[in-house]
Amino acid sequence: AYLSGKKYIAVSNEQSSNESNIEGEKINHQYSKSFEFEEEFRWYINNYLEDHVQYFSMLRPLNELQIAKLFSNMKKYHKIFRSCNIGSKETPWKWCCNCSKCLFVFIILSPYLYKKKLVKIFKKDLYENKDLLNIFIELCGYGEVKPFECVGTPEEVNYAISRTIKQLETEGKELPYLLNYYKENYKLVDTNTDIEKRYNEENNVPKEFEKLLKDLIFNDENEKI
């Protein structure tokens, strides 16, 4: 950006990237995605390069649920998006369906996409995979440690799971293995919260882009598809 005279360096690290992975220790598995790094890198640019270059994350004000909800409507990308590090080592890049990233993305999309759509993306119903139980428990925040991967917070995971369970029960459908395990062992969280309408003010998004983000969040009332 500096050499080519560009004004912005925009990355895509959401609010959840700030959460540490080790309880009692502020250890982030990928420091470069945290707001702390963003602030320090901006300081470096301003002091050693040119202050006209702005480094920021466009997604910093948003949580994983908000991003998943918005993405659920971007149907043309459902066939091609990937977020699996294990599957990235294969050609073509695919979802391995056995790791914490795959399960997290499946969970976070489940309140907004019906099972048929999710299975079309992942080729499997990950909620029926008993081998994922330990990862499932860790993602919910009930394990010894949060998976050392780019996954969301237990608050986001528990909200998505609880909302999906309530949706399936309202529709009179049987709960898949992992969701049934959750209901039998944990208390469903309150889904009547503001979590889908929050705007994290700890961000460096330029003013000219703020309205776009807020319009997307506060005016988005899409139904499950």
Where are these regions (language model features)?
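Nucleotide-activated chemistry modules centered on ATP-dependent adenylation/adenylyltransferase
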Residues: 1-225
